[in-house]
Curated annotation (Swiss-Prot):
<dbReference type="InterPro" id="IPR007169">
    <property type="entry name" value="RemA-like"/>
</dbReference>
<feature type="compositionally biased region" description="Acidic residues">
    <location>
        <begin position="78"/>
        <end position="105"/>
    </location>
</feature>
<dbReference type="Pfam" id="PF04025">
    <property type="entry name" value="RemA-like"/>
</dbReference>
<protein>
    <recommendedName>
        <fullName>Putative regulatory protein COPRO5265_1186</fullName>
    </recommendedName>
</protein>
<comment type="similarity">
    <text>Belongs to the RemA family.</text>
</comment>
<feature type="region of interest" description="Disordered">
    <location>
        <begin position="76"/>
        <end position="105"/>
    </location>
</feature>
Length: 105
């Protein structure tokens, strides 16, 4: 989860390395944080006019609003992590085994 980008909907992406948390905007404290961020110019609205379903908290103090549910965003992050693990370079030992067996490891 250190590099790459997360699709937050409507062809909008955010750097995974900058994400602190993904929360539902339904609670009063989160709504207050969103209001303050808007007043301070630290709010990015990526909902394209749709209902806000997730608030993404970033390292720089920005809050990014998304129309995608937090659970969906987290599952996209997990899928990306799994894909990175599958595409990691194989070790020398695994390469030798692959050559011997003629199969993918």
């Amino acid at each position: 989860m250190e590099s790459g980008f997360l699709n937050i909907g409507f062809s909008s992406y955010i750097s995974v390395s900058k994400i602190i948390g993904i929360v539902s905007p339904d609670s009063a404290p989160i709504r207050r944080m969103i209001r303050l961020a808007k007043e301070q110019g630290r709010l990015v609205d990526a909902t394209f006019g749709r209902r806000t379903r997730a608030a993404i908290l970033t390292e720089g103090g920005f809050i990014v609003l998304s129309a995608v549910l937090p659970d969906t965003l987290v599952s996209r992050l997990e899928e990306e992590e799994e894909e990175e693990e599958r595409t990691e370079p194989i070790t020398e030992q695994e390469a030798e085994l692959e050559e011997e067996s003629g199969e993918d490891v």
